[in-house]
């Protein structure tokens, strides 16, 4: 499958170390660094997941005209992902999330980022480049990966979504708060529970599936969403398309780190939807894939062979 990915570029940076003493300067641990590592995050991680699953991703994003932007592009190239759709902006910095980890536990996370919307010039560049790609490639699905860092604007989404609808290409969205209500007329909308409740402005009990169903159905109809997919972390997922609204529990497993699980879920769900799989299979596959990456520390893509083996064991 060929997939267009649009969204925020992030470098997930890790300092792995050990803590053996407390600082004499303040009551904080001293971490002796053993290893440093950088990985593509955000829309980059979705692209890596897609490639690991056998798809061809075309990523469109904006980075700063800085060393970290060059690093991000190098990480993509090393992962076998084209950087033709990565545009630079000297007025922005490339987003970096730096995590310090000891014995599998996060000590602290430090974010360096720009959150303002991209300018109209970059907006136009991305829209034009995507239009040309759609004219020359058979694209199976378009995924919008929004981390509220400014790449996805209401105008960019609207223009690209119109192109997708006119060509019969399904669209999937992994939203954040800022543009939550801008995403209308999409094929798949995948917030987590916190994003969903904040987005609709209603407090819900995560265990009250009847209330979630009512709120989800109302929102889905209002936004004209074909398939609404809400992840509920340890409780599994809720998925509904109007004809069927159902909760699917999570498989019990050890959780090491939830970072990047949402990227994996939107990747698997989008491919499954584009392949016209049924709602139950989409839910189980995505649920399973998200759980697999939660068993590893840091932002990592799903392993295709491991996913296939687990699916066979679960008779999916």
Predicted features and spans:
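Conserved phosphate-binding/catalytic loop of the ribokinase/pfkB sugar-kinase fold
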Residues: 86-92, 99-136
